[in-house]
Amino acid sequence: EMRKAEGENIKQDLLVRIERVQNLVDKIAENSKGIVEEYVSKLEKRVKEILKTDVVDENRIAQEAVIYADKTSIEEELTRLNSHIVQFKELVNSDGPVGKKLDFMIQEMNRETNTIGSKAGSGEITKAVIDLKVELEDIREQIQNIE
């Protein structure tokens, strides 16, 4: 009875924590919108200042924007994180030993989070990534208590 009650408490705790993870992932997704446009605007301004002209090569700016967007896009990582969150919830709600699988899921989520952190184009994203890492670490520690 005690183990079952403790198991239920851990399960509820993990579900609350993974919901926090989901909220942070959503926040990162929201903050990632408009970053490329912001970059293009800054780039155009910088080029005009350096060249001391109001005429800029729009094609060149567009090329740079594509390169920047390619390097900083976190769409794939966000998609995978959302997929991992769904799988995590399914595992937590399933019967049987899931500790090892959950541990691997957290490792994968950490990997995606680190990639997002290395591509972060704003302070808001960086802050959310740090919060996400803390939350994932807390989940990882909690998982150590289950089979």
Question: Can you name each region flagged by the protein language model?
Answer:
Residues 1-147:
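N-terminal intrinsically disordered, cationic/polar leader segments
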